[in-house]
UniProtKB/Swiss-Prot annotation:
Binding locations of Mn(2+) 1: 248, 260
GO cellular component: cytoplasm
UniProt entry tagged with the keyword Manganese: yes
Taxonomic source organism: Sodalis glossinidius (strain morsitans)
Family named by the database record: Belongs to the RimK family.
Biological process, per Gene Ontology: protein modification process; SOS response; translation
Gene it is expressed from: rimK
Residues the record lists as binding ATP: 141, 178-179, 187, 211-213
Name used for this protein in its record: Probable alpha-L-glutamate ligase
ATP-grasp domain sequence ranges: 104-287
EC number, as in UniProt: 6.3.2.-
């Protein structure tokens, strides 16, 4: 099998692990920077070019597209899809997951429980928005934030109004969410591949913070989850059309709440904490999908 990993940096842990896992199973792997690709878009002979040469066919593509390169990265991935390459996560699914507002709307439409979330444009609606999510304390999140960046805990109503006014002053799109106090600065990351949860970790915020992201200095440990949590994680990934996803769940009194679904979950923290070879599981999933394709 000939594989392409779409990544801006082939030295990153997740990219290295995927490359090593694929090579260990006898596959040829190229790491391709999507921003160095350019495309010929036509119905007769579409093509992808990379650093001055036309790329040959790849059986499958593993997208490791960062948030800052979503628009161009998914355009390149669409071109690979048009040329017949199997995408581990399809471009449309990645685009859905990267739009926090759209993804929450899709999850809610599927009946998946979420933290109460508000969204508004007019400053006149700020008071109602705060009340809608249960008042302070509450969380204000940039729609385009990632890895805990652009996430603020407002502990009082006045603080919430100030944060919302500041984000509006920056012309930034943001969400307002209830603060789930009983989660205690912890969340559960479920790594979903296909219709299975293959690894689970509980992430803890560092002292003095409420964000549990490992990139923000949080820690992680392997945990077990309930059947309800497992079902919610699988349902959330499927609702966005993702074959591989990191589903982040808050453990609330009323049950598991999906906080976010990550279309390009990092492997370092969850492989270390769970002691699972997730990279190889991703490669074997691709092998099975390609085998299904060829048997049709």
């Amino acid at each position: 099998m000939k594989l392409a990993i779409l990544s801006r940096d082939g030295t990153l842990f997740s990219c290295r692990r995927l490359r090593e896992a694929a090579q260990a199973r006898g596959h040829k792997v190229d790491v391709i920077d999507p921003l160095s690709c350019y495309m010929n878009i036509n119905s007769a002979a579409p093509s992808i070019h990379y650093r001055g040469r036309r790329l040959k066919h790849y059986d499958a593509v593993i997208p490791r597209i960062g948030p800052l390169t979503t628009f161009y990265g998914t355009a390149v991935l669409r071109q690979f899809e048009m040329l017949g390459s199997y995408a581990l996560n399809e471009s449309a699914a990645i685009t859905r997951a990267r739009d926090k507002l759209h993804s929450l709307q899709l999850l809610a439409r599927q009946g998946i429980d979420l933290p109460i979330t508000g969204f508004a444009d007019s400053p006149d609606d700020t008071g109602d928005l705060i009340t809608m999510v249960g008042g302070a304390p509450l969380v204000v999140k940039l729609v385009e934030g990632t890895q805990g960046i652009g996430v603020v805990l407002a502990e009082t109503r006045q603080a919430a109004e100030s944060v919302i006014d500041a984000f509006r002053g920056l012309k930034a799109q943001f969400l307002v969410q209830e603060f789930v106090a009983e989660a205690g600065g912890r969340d559960v990351r479920c790594l979903v591949i296909g219709d299975k949860v293959v690894a689970v970790i509980e992430r803890h915020a560092k002292e003095g913070d409420f964000r549990s992201n490992l990139h923000r200095g949080g820690s992680a440990r392997a945990v077990t989850i309930s059947a309800a949590e497992r079902a919610v994680a699988i349902h959330a990934a499927a609702a966005l059309g993702l074959n591989v996803a990191g589903v982040d769940i808050l453990r609330a009194k009323r049950g598991p709440l999906v906080m976010e679904v990550n279309a390009s979950p990092g492997l370092e923290g969850i492989e270390a904490a769970s002691d699972m070879d997730i990279a190889t599981l991703m490669i074997t999933f691709i092998e099975a999908r390609l085998a299904d394709r060829s048997s049709r």
